[in-house]
Amino acid sequence: MTDFSPREIVSELDRFIVGQSDAKRAVSIALRNRWRRLQLEGALREEVLPKNILMIGPTGVGKTEIARRLAKLAGAPFIKVEATKFTEVGYVGRDVEQIIRDLVEVAIAQVREKKRKDVQARAQLAAEERVLDALVGASASPATRDSFRKKLRAGELNDKEIEVETQASSGSPMFEIPGMPGAQIGAVSLGDIFGKMGGRTKTRRLTVADSHEILVNEEADKLLDSDQLTIEAINAVENNGIVFLDEIDKICVRDGRSGGEVSREGVQRDLLPLIEGTTVSTKHGAVKTDHILFIASGAFHIAKPSDLLPELQGRLPIRVELNALSRDDMRRILTEPEVSLIKQYVALLGTEGVTLEFGDDAIDALADVAVQVNSTVENIGARRLQTVMERVLDEISFSAPDRSGETIRIDAEFVQKHVGDLAKNADLSRFIL
């Protein structure tokens, strides 16, 4: 769990996301409050609940990116789900408790990866012994093994093929029984039981280089205590887990509508206990959701936040409105973030030996085209820049292997030549941009 101050968290988010200072402040305070709660003792710690957030703003302005970067920064178990994927219990589809089960799987993978690093040195030695067994046999003399060990460490045997016994994945089918929350669990647990009883392995023919990572991971997993790993993962979910619920506006029930709305309202009702705090059964054990942070987001083009069930509105106390992107924002998105679009394209074409140079007038022209198309067709925010950039650089990307060593300067004239006419023609833009 990170102990960054809210100011440091905002500063970190500024490296990747342009603008939206209100949203950044809200999530930075929410993250800092997780750390503050963990400093409390006893009963008070249990009583302090997270203040869940509702982000309201058009598509492509940074809602998902803020949540994703926040989770990365926190090193917390994080899952992004679309609210529209879920149905009310009793309907065909996934029930909302599956969100927590998936979050536990994410946490287990995270903890396992971290613990593997702790036993990396021992695992590498054990993997090396298995490779030597495959190369010279288990009964080879110490002198022979030492000779081959030196060659192995020098990389001289990387291309040599060996046969190794590796763990076979259980491959057990997973069944979802509609209307039965957690029905999937039984099938998975059964598969695990039979997998462990059989201890199945399979022989694979691999090069020494390819076998290295597989064998190191297997040996590391043997050194890990799986029960302790699961306990740590569940603890991480319960105290630091973050769930990002996208498209929450699509499950709003609007006045005077019926039919499919029934299931939508049911999804909202199913979400209530999850956000308020309940215990969810997973195949790894029970998980309490009281201290999981929920960040819901939606464009709310048609529905309004007040169309959500009043109880659900009450469980999302912090409201943040994200602004639509201006021309200046578009320009900044192209150049300011550490991994801006222009830097990405320069690096990609640099691998072919092509040097791309963007003039200031080209950046202005790209921003103008994106804003123009967003205003005439459909406003998809910063995502429009990707479409425009692809169109502008289409010819260069295609012919790059034949143009190695060239320096290509992109200016406003170049941009207008490739997308200017399309941007002016709304009918063409609708299909091409």
UniProtKB/Swiss-Prot annotation:
Q: Has the keyword Transcription regulation been applied to this entry? A: no
Superkingdom of the organism of origin: Bacteria
Task: Write out the entry's keywords from A to Z.
Answer: ATP-binding, Chaperone, Cytoplasm, Nucleotide-binding, Stress response
Residues binding ATP, per UniProt: V18, G60, V61, G62, K63, T64, E65, D246, E311, R383
Q: What is its main location?
A: cytoplasm
InterPro entries named among the record's database cross-references: AAA+_ATPase (IPR003593), ATP-dep_Clp_protease_ClpX (IPR050052), ATPase_AAA_core (IPR003959), Clp_ATPase_C (IPR019489), HslU (IPR004491), P-loop_NTPase (IPR027417)
| Annotated SUPFAM superfamilies | P-loop containing nucleoside triphosphate hydrolases
The yes or no answer to whether the keyword Lipid biosynthesis is present is no
* GO cellular component labels: HslUV protease complex
Give a GO molecular function annotation for the protein. ATP hydrolysis activity
Pfam families documented for this protein: AAA (PF00004), AAA_2 (PF07724)
Compartment(s) where it occurs, according to its Swiss-Prot or TrEMBL record: Cytoplasm
The record's section on Gene3D superfamilies has: 1.10.8.60, DNA helicase RuvA subunit, C-terminal domain (1.10.8.10), P-loop containing nucleotide triphosphate hydrolases (3.40.50.300)
Q: Name one GO biological process term.
A: proteolysis involved in protein catabolic process
Quote the subunit structure annotation: A double ring-shaped homohexamer of HslV is capped on each side by a ring-shaped HslU homohexamer. The assembly of the HslU/HslV complex is dependent on binding of ATP.
Instruction: Name the NCBIfam families for this protein.
Output: hslU, PRK05201.1
Q: Which family does it belong to?
A: Belongs to the ClpX chaperone family. HslU subfamily.
Q: What does this protein do?
A: ATPase subunit of a proteasome-like degradation complex; this subunit has chaperone activity. The binding of ATP and its subsequent hydrolysis by HslU are essential for unfolding of protein substrates subsequently hydrolyzed by HslV. HslU recognizes the N-terminal part of its protein substrates and unfolds these before they are guided to HslV for hydrolysis.
Under what name is this protein listed?
ATP-dependent protease ATPase subunit HslU
State the organism's lineage: Bacteria, Pseudomonadati, Pseudomonadota, Alphaproteobacteria, Hyphomicrobiales
Whichever gene encodes this chain, its name is hslU
